[in-house]
UniProtKB/Swiss-Prot annotation:
GO cellular component: ribonucleoprotein complex; ribosome
SUPFAM superfamilies: RL5-like (SSF55282)
Gene it is expressed from: rplE
Source species of the chain: Dinoroseobacter shibae (strain DSM 16493 / NCIMB 14021 / DFL 12)
Domain of life: Bacteria
Protein name: Large ribosomal subunit protein uL5
Amino acid sequence: MLDAATYTPRLKAAYAETIRAAMKEEFGYKNDMMIPRLDKIVLNIGAGAEAVKDSKKAKSAQDDLSAIAGQRAVITKAKKSIAGFRVREDMPLGAKVTLRGDRMYEFLDRLITIAMPRIRDFRGVKGSAFDGRGNYALGLKEHIVFPEINFDKVDEVWGMDIIICTTAASDAEAKALLKHFNMPFNS
């Protein structure tokens, strides 16, 4: 059994032992605090039209996202009414969760080593999906690629957004950091 007091996630240990030194050498940082690190990972499931018709769909998305993240997700609600979409203010539309610390490193490890290889016809993620400030966004068409989701008990297959926020000053630094974490970029 793992001792919670001494356990360190695999990617967090790799960052401390090898990735920091490699990044410092690659970019010539003068100060250790200049070295980019992961800040947070935000997961989002938008239930969309299904949630408008049935409010239980947002609760289902929340339960699935909580299982994937390992911490409770919050239900996202509409900020304002839009008559064309039949959406009313405060209507539940999906779920989101923000991961930091050890849970963030554990999720990134599961995403890269378990979930991405399970995606059909997977050829890597786009290397151009950075926002100009060192953050990376990717989308999955099916949330069932995560082992925490029991395929037989899923009533709806959701797409999900994953935003990886770093402290990097540029996209090149953030891409190098994620490459050191073995993110499978296709370009």
